[in-house]
Amino acid sequence: MAKFIRNLADKAPSMVAAAVTYSKPRLATFWHYARVELVPPTLGEIPTAIQSMKSIIHSAQTGNFKHLTVKEAVLNGLVATEVWMWFYIGEIIGKRGIVGYDV
């Protein structure tokens, strides 16, 4: 066991350096898209979002959603699932734990 720990301690700096080298470009890409995609909506985008919600409610009331193509229905389902999961992530962060959720 001591040999394993000594061997691991000898290899740790090179393993950490390799991990840092591997993750630097990926982290830069992540931060680029995070800055673009995770910004709050501007005041000009809010009326567009409200109009979009009104059209969704109207299509649900009139039954127009039955005329969606399969591709549109799948995309709408994926977006709804993403919003639902972000809600759960926010709840988990707010409670500071997964306990109490059927995850």
UniProtKB/Swiss-Prot annotation:
Its main location: mitochondrion. The keyword Amino-acid biosynthesis does not apply. The keyword Mitochondrion applies. Transmembrane segments: none annotated. The modification N6-acetyllysine is found at residues 11, 24, 54. Keywords: Acetylation, ATP synthesis, CF(0), Hydrogen ion transport, Ion transport, Membrane, Mitochondrion, Mitochondrion inner membrane, Transport. It is found in: Mitochondrion; Mitochondrion inner membrane. GO terms for cellular component: mitochondrial inner membrane; proton-transporting ATP synthase complex. One of its GO terms (molecular function) is proton transmembrane transporter activity. GO terms for biological process: proton motive force-driven ATP synthesis; proton motive force-driven mitochondrial ATP synthesis. Pfam families: ATP-synt_G (PF04718). Signal peptide: none annotated. The modification N-acetylalanine is found at residue 2. Component of the ATP synthase complex composed at least of ATP5F1A/subunit alpha, ATP5F1B/subunit beta, ATP5MC1/subunit c (homooctomer), MT-ATP6/subunit a, MT-ATP8/subunit 8, ATP5ME/subunit e, ATP5MF/subunit f, ATP5MG/subunit g, ATP5MK/subunit k, ATP5MJ/subunit j, ATP5F1C/subunit gamma, ATP5F1D/subunit delta, ATP5F1E/subunit epsilon, ATP5PF/subunit F6, ATP5PB/subunit b, ATP5PD/subunit d, ATP5PO/subunit OSCP. PANTHER family: ATP SYNTHASE SUBUNIT (PTHR12386). Belongs to the ATPase g subunit family. Subunit g, of the mitochondrial membrane ATP synthase complex (F(1)F(0) ATP synthase or Complex V) that produces ATP from ADP in the presence of a proton gradient across the membrane which is generated by electron transport complexes of the respiratory chain. ATP synthase complex consist of a soluble F(1) head domain - the catalytic core - and a membrane F(1) domain - the membrane proton channel. These two domains are linked by a central stalk rotating inside the F(1) region and a stationary peripheral stalk. This is ATP synthase F(0) complex subunit g, mitochondrial. It comes from Rattus norvegicus (Rat).
